[in-house]
A protein has these predicted regions:
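Short, well-structured N-terminal submotif of metal-dependent ribonuclease cores
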Residues: 1-45
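Acidic active-site catalytic centers that drive phospho-/nucleotidyl reactions
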Residues: 6, 110, 129
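A generic structural signal for short hydrophobic patches within well-formed alpha-helices
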Residues: 10, 50, 132-133
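Glycine-rich, phosphate-binding/catalytic loops in enzymes
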Residues: 20-23, 60, 141-144
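PIN-domain endoribonuclease scaffold, especially VapC-family toxins
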Residues: 34-39, 47-97
Length: 163
């Protein structure tokens, strides 16, 4: 598996997302374990995704599976079999943030993941961030796939999840 992992997946894997259930946590642990064992995580060359991971996870790799994944990514930064880094370009445009994206209203903190997905064509793994479902028209327009690991938590209200 080759994928971009939204930070919320790692937080849920650690059991720290209060509204995620045990099934969601298991799905997140399973996904990041599969990537760690025989997959590739895709990051940006500027370090934005890694910086966000660092804000929520521990370099020691403990105490949870999300922390272990972060340590795995950090330790394998220069192993092209485990970590792929793609180039994205920052632009001075509040409506885009990255050259790879059209004007959009996606949460600014999520735009780096989308820009990496546009360049790499890898899917984004999401657990609990409903912004991805809210932005499904944008995501479709740039031909990106968001894999919802926990569809029961990835929408606002009772609206059906669009995949």
């Amino acid at each position: 598996m080759r994928a971009i992992v939204d930070t919320n997946v790692l937080v849920v894997a650690n059991g720290l997302e209060t509204h995620a259930d045990a099934e969601c946590q298991r799905e997140c642990v399973s996904a990041i374990t599969a990537i760690s064992v025989n997959g590739t995580v895709v990051l940006d060359n500027l370090g934005f995704i890694l910086d966000e991971y660092q804000e929520h996870l521990n370099f020691s790799g403990q105490p949870g599976p999300g922390d272990a994944f972060f340590k795995h990514v950090y330790d394998n930064m220069y192993s092209s079999k485990r970590v792929e880094r793609v180039s994205i370009t920052v632009v001075d445009d509040e409506k885009r943030a990255f050259e790879e994206l059209p004007a959009n209203t996606l949460d600014r903190s999520d735009r780096k993941f989308l820009a990496v997905a546009v360049v790499s064509k890898a899917p984004i793994l999401n657990a609990t961030d409903s912004d991805w479902d809210d932005a499904r028209a944008l995501i479709s327009s740039v031909e990106v796939v968001v894999k919802q690991l926990c569809p029961q938590h990835a929408t606002r209200g009772n609206r059906p999840l669009q995949t």
